Amino acid sequence: MLLSISLILILGMFMGWICQKIKLPSLLGMLITGIVLGPYVLNLLDDSILGISAELRKIALIIILTRAGLGLDLSGLKKIGRPAVLMCFVPASFELIGMILLAPKLMGLTALEAAIMGAVLAAVSPAVVVPRMVKLMDEGYGVNEGIPQLILAGASVDDVYVIVLFSTFVGMMQGEGASILKFVNIPISIFLGIAIGLLIGVLLAYFFKKMHIRDTSKVLIILSISFLLVVMEDKLSTPITFSALIAIMFIGIGLQKKRETVAKRLSVKYGKLWVAAEVFLFVLVGATVNIGYLGKVGVKALIVIIGALVFRMFGVFVCLLGTSLKRKERLFTMLAYTPKATVQAAIGGIPLALGFTCGDLVLTVAVLAIVLTAPL
C-alpha cells in the first residue's frame, strides 16, 4: 500500500505539473497517471488502495464542498439576483433532460440509467471554475458586468443540486421506487440539509469562540462531523431524509456568518488538504477506467456528451435573458459554465461500485467528459 500511495502522489503531482506547463488543467495529468498505473494498463496499484477508492473519493468530495461553503459569498448571490439563482439549477436541469433524451437512443440505456448518467455529468466543476474565476476577478476582467461572480455563485449550489438528484436516481435504481414522495423528498432534503448545516455551523462558531483550540483541530472536528453526517444519511431508512452534502457545505456557510475570520483561516487549511485530496481523487478515478471499454463507446459517448452540453449552454442562455450582457459575454459565460471534473470524479464510479449494469458506461463517459471539457 505504501508503494501505491507514493506512486499516486509523486507521479500524480508530476504529471499535473507537466499539464500546467502546457496550459492544461493539472487534473488531466492526474487522470492519465491513474489510467497508466491502474489495473487495465500497468497494474501497479495495490488492491488494498483500490478497495477503499470509493471512500477516499468521498472524502475528497467532502473537503471541496466544505471549502466551497467556507468561501461562498451569499451576499454576492443576492446582489447579482435572478440570474445567479437560476444558474444554480437551470443549466444542470437542461443538461439532464438532454441526456435523458439522447442516451437511450444512442447508447441503449433505460430512461433511469440515462438519468443517472445525466446526474453524474450535469454538475460544473469548482476545481476548474473557481480558480479561473478568481483569477479573472483579480485581473479585473468582467467584474463590472458581474460575470465571474455570477459563475462562482451558481457553481457550488449547482453541484449540490445535482448530487441530490443523483442520490435520488440511485435510490430508485436500487428498487426504492419512483414514488411521488421520492421527488417531494428532493426539496425537503435540500432544506433540511441547509437547516442542519447552518445549525451545526452556528454551534461550532459558538464552541470555537468559547474554546480556544488550534485551527488544525477545528478542521479535524469539522471533518469528523461531516463524516458522521454522511453515515447518518446512508443509515436513514425513513421516506424523508436530509442531504448530508448540502449540510456539509452549509456548516461552512454558518461558520462564516458568525466567525468570518475563523472561516477564512479554515478555508486556507482546507485548501492545503485539497492539494493531496485532489491527487488521490483524480488518480484513483483514472485507475478505475477500462481503456478497452472506452474504445467501444468512444464516438457515441462523444456525441452524447456534446449534445448534452448544447442543452446545458441553452440553459445558461435562458438564465441570462433580460440581463445587459453583450453577445460575446453571454457566449463566454455559456462556455465557462461547462467544465467537468470534481463531481464527476467523486460520483462517476458509484454506479459501478454498486454493481449497476450501466456502471462501466457511466464511469467511462464521465472520464471522457472531464478530458473533453476541463481544458475549456
Regions found by a protein language model. Name each.
Residues 1-376:
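Transmembrane helical cores of multi-pass secondary ion antiporters/exchangers
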